[in-house]
Amino acid sequence: MDIIRTIEEMRSWRQKAGRVALVPTMGNLHEGHLALVREAKKQAERVVVSIFVNRLQFGQGEDFDSYPRTFEADRDKLAAAGVDALFLPDERELYPRIRQDFNVEPPHIQDELCGAFRPGHFRGVATVVTKLFNIVQPDAACFGKKDFQQLHIIQAMVADLNQPVKVVPVDIGRAADGLALSSRNGYLSAGEREEAPRLFRELSRIRENLIDGENDYASLEQDARATLEQHGWRVDYVEIRQADTLELAHAGEKRLVVLAAARIGKTRLIDNVEIFR
């Protein structure tokens, strides 16, 4: 596996690589990331994984400084998974002037759901993903459905800006008890880890009610919020949206997604389930 640290080296490697699939990450890799790698290997002859903890997508008071940097373990996992190249730029390589004067500004959806609690987050995501697309020039790029809003924004960005990249969604990886795999799960104490699967259970309960024909979305959302809060969670949101557009859902719609973000202890977890009825 080649380890590439500069844009110049990445572009030189790319010229000889044939069809390439990219998996953008912030490191601290887990089985969910490796599932993205496996899908990427189906999409292209060569696979590039990027590791870059992107300051632009962290807000004030968030965990940029404490976000786990686990390079040696990540490198070993990627090599064992058969990745062809690891793109590992430092911050000055991607942001030579530190600040970024030109950004990719998503539409109003960036201010809803997670965006309402993380101002500027999706601008930072869209900007760094565009930079990675410009540098690596992948034919395909794999993104997990756990970050459903992020996936939607990237798909819309690629379509609207005619970026020549196939965006490949990959299903959420889960632990045996249903908890969505996340690098931030490592922040959980033993007791919090035991409680954490409740988020998925509440979303699954909403899904069952929707499949059974329930259309009182507000009551379903409120019941889930109340249950989580009774068990010590601080809930940012539980919302039922249109799966294809992330617009507000209306009674009787067939393609839905239930999205949630909530904190248990100091750890913010997100999850979602899709419904096709």
UniProtKB/Swiss-Prot annotation:
ATP binds at residues 26-33, 144-147, 173, 181-184. The keyword Cytoplasm applies. It is found in: Cytoplasm. Catalyzes the condensation of pantoate with beta-alanine in an ATP-dependent reaction via a pantoyl-adenylate intermediate. Homodimer. The keyword Ligase applies. Pfam families: Pantoate_ligase. InterPro entries: Cyt_trans-like (IPR004821), Pantoate_ligase (IPR003721), Pantoate_ligase_C (IPR042176), Rossmann-like_a/b/a_fold (IPR014729). SUPFAM superfamilies: Nucleotidylyl transferase (SSF52374). GO terms for biological process: pantothenate biosynthetic process. GO terms for molecular function: ATP binding; pantoate-beta-alanine ligase activity. Its EC number is 6.3.2.1. It is an enzyme of class 6 (ligase). Beta-alanine binds at residue 57. GO terms for cellular component: cytosol. Keywords: ATP-binding, Cytoplasm, Ligase, Nucleotide-binding, Pantothenate biosynthesis. CDD domains: PanC. The active site is at 33 (proton donor). Pathway: Cofactor biosynthesis; (R)-pantothenate biosynthesis; (R)-pantothenate from (R)-pantoate and beta-alanine: step 1/1. The reaction proceeds by a bi uni uni bi ping pong mechanism. It comes from the Bacteria. It catalyses: (R)-pantoate + beta-alanine + ATP = (R)-pantothenate + AMP + diphosphate + H(+). This is Pantothenate synthetase. (R)-pantoate binds at residues 57, 150. Its main location: cytoplasm. Belongs to the pantothenate synthetase family.
